[in-house]
Amino acid sequence: MKKIFCFITLLLSVEKLIAQTTYSKDIEAQIKQVENNLAERVIINGKPGNIFDRMNHYNVKGLSIAVVQNYKIVWAKGYGWADEKEKRPVTTKTLFVPGSISKTFNALGILKLAQDKKLDLDTDINTYLQSWKFPYDSLSKGKKITLKHLLSHSAGLSFLGSDGYSRTAKIPTLQQLLDPNPASGLSGVRSEFEPGLYHQYSNGGIVISQVLITDITRQPYEKFMYDNVLKPLGMTESFFNQPPQANKLKLLATGYNADGTELAGKFNIIPEQAAGGLWTTPTDVCKYIIETQLAYQGKSAKLLTQEMTKLHLTPTVDPVAALGVFIDKRGETKYFTHDARNYGYSGVYYGSMEGGNGVAVFLNSFNVDLLPEIANSVATVYQWKDFYTPVFRNEINLPDSIFRKYTGDYLFENKLASIFKKQDGYYYWADGINSKMHFANEQEFYNQEFRVEKTFTNNAAGKITGYMRKVDGKELPPAIKITNPDTLTVPIDQLNSLAWHLIENKQYQQAIQYLKRGIVLAPNELSVTINLAHSYLFNNEYDKAIKIYAKQLTTAITHNETAKEMISQDFMFFKKNGFDKKLMRKVLSDLKLEIPKGF
């Protein structure tokens, strides 16, 4: 208790140090309201929280906020530490590299080139690419990828995940990132389905657009983006330089992991600048929000015309995915938005399509959970209609003896869910999300992340049979507890996703059961077979695992990834998450596969 009190006292003293601007009494009162109205979707056992308490709860070292009202930035403020060891506080000038918000500004760069007739958004990207060409194959079904596809994540491309690179590492070129390289654990960017079919988020597509910009303009990406996008918007504190310039280092927020430990090297280098390499401030991002709101109404054109701005904010294949932004409808009000997450950082912004409201929030933390609480508080204080309507619920504590009978896997509407225990409580997994369980009574539970309320059901003998589901009082098809995975006939991606979740939580026996069923349902699905090998491996059944690995190394390409690439990628993931590195090295050695650097 004493430590917590000291931490909060320290933060309060830091707040005094970082008061960069003196506001009117009315604005100061609004700031205090925002600071004391933080809340999740469900407010449990009481009232909204205080910003310092919530920072402490989530291990967030520092954050920065800027708020827009009536097309003006009404206040901006920093909280906590930009660097805890250096005792360097967050100010409104502190720079963050939150991640995918970069995609919004990359889209503006493409749209500016289209507005200037330097390119066409509906033309094959290979028309403009010079230093690298996209290798079409049969999966694209003869259809060509356009810039509209890339910016709206509808090009049918693989993801291209990246954690960034340490400041001492050798940084790959974009061309090296775009082409498969099993030795370095890079899967490259290739077609997974035909362009324009549906939405699939892809960093890879955005990286291709970055290459395209440099090929067309014959300028370094960061120079073109500063001169033609950031500077016209008045975002003069921001930049895309990777690594950052030496004279900016003292303005950079140090990144922190979700547990509050400092990121090695303080920040990573991100060669995928368009996808996640923008260093910026909430104040600068709010300048973009305001200009976009005004340009949308035809009242400004610092960068884009009204016509091009409307195109920027218009969804294409997916009803919410526009060009560089997502459209979030709350009641009758639409917001353009993008969230973001890099290792050590996270952020989000919202701008209303009408009315001139907005907010941008950045954290130097990999933990994103505080972001919606701050956005909800701003929306409440500034009365954004329908943006946030809290649900008030009570929670009771249940003994493990009751909890244990609920653990297991469930089936609802052709989807799978799982209930399991972690050190800090019981969790509900579905759709790839781990969500903590809160109980209103012995059988009814709810989650912050899901609107569906759930009530366990049991038979006459008291055995749990499933749970009832409802939203806003409307009954949904119930979930049934799975007693025999061998009878399941669900989509293979559901089986595979659940199995991967079980592997992550070291429930290898259960994973094996589901993956065996997956092979019956989809015998040619390479990822299912490889995941079965992983399950055997970590379940101390080495011979079974190595036999499957060896056989699959001769299997044909599935989704343009060979078994070798899958094994390499998955092992890199397992290594980062504390799995047995020596065991995986033995597999790679026995299979005569190249061992990636740092393994």
Regions found by a protein language model. Give the residues of each.
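Short, surface-exposed loop or secondary-structure junction motifs
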Residues: 79, 83, 137-343, 347-349
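Catalytic loop of the DD-peptidase/beta-lactamase superfamily, centered on the K-T-G motif
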Residues: 20-77, 214-227, 266-496
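Short active-site loop at a secondary-structure junction
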Residues: 57-66, 85-149, 191-204, 273-276, ...
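Terminal, low-structured helical/coil segments at or just beyond the last alpha-helical repeat
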Residues: 561-599
